[in-house]
């Protein structure tokens, strides 16, 4: 365990450098929005790299993009549910002290959170941090896969729709 701690500063620095490299690579992709870095942050630390897509501009929803990225060998996740739909924040389901003590402040089912819903249900794409441990090759491969998927977005969307129709019966 101690050896891992000793390696951490160099690994964190590499992830930070590769995240900046990924930001640059994705800034060229239509319909992709990278997270803006707050200038007050001195270090960028993460276990997942998160970016957003505009489904209309990119050509598909985030779940289809993540499925296609998985097929390309890029570990991907659509992220968490929006807060008002997330079980952890439902006082009737939570064992946490604060939601149980103040359930009136945690009545998320009756809240309208359109930005959170849009981000979580349509836009967010989370990449595994292992991509960044592979150096520029890992980032280049992931960025190339994202660009390839976008070039084929119409065909992939049509295939996905055919599958939805087939299995909704």
Model-derived regions: residue spans:
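PLP-dependent aminotransferase class I/II
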Residues: 1-169
């Amino acid at each position: 365990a101690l050896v891992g701690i000793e390696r951490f500063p160099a690994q964190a620095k590499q992830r930070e450098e590769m995240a900046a490299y990924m930001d640059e690579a994705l800034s060229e992709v239509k319909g992709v929005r990278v997270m803006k870095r707050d200038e007050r942050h001195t270090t960028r630390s993460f276990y997942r790299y998160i970016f957003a897509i505009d489904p209309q501009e990119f050509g598909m929803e985030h779940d289809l993009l993540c499925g296609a990225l998985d097929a390309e060998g890029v570990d991907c996740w659509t992220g968490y549910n929006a807060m008002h739909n997330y079980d952890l924040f439902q006082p009737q389901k939570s064992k946490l002290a604060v939601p149980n003590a103040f359930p009136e402040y945690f009545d998320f089912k009756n809240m309208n959170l359109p930005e959170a819903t849009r981000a979580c249900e349509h836009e967010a794409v989370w990449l595994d941090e292992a991509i960044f441990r592979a150096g520029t090759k890992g980032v280049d491969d992931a960025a190339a896969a994202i660009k390839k998927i976008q070039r084929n977005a119409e065909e992939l969307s049509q295939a996905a729709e055919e599958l939805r129709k087939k299995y909704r019966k």
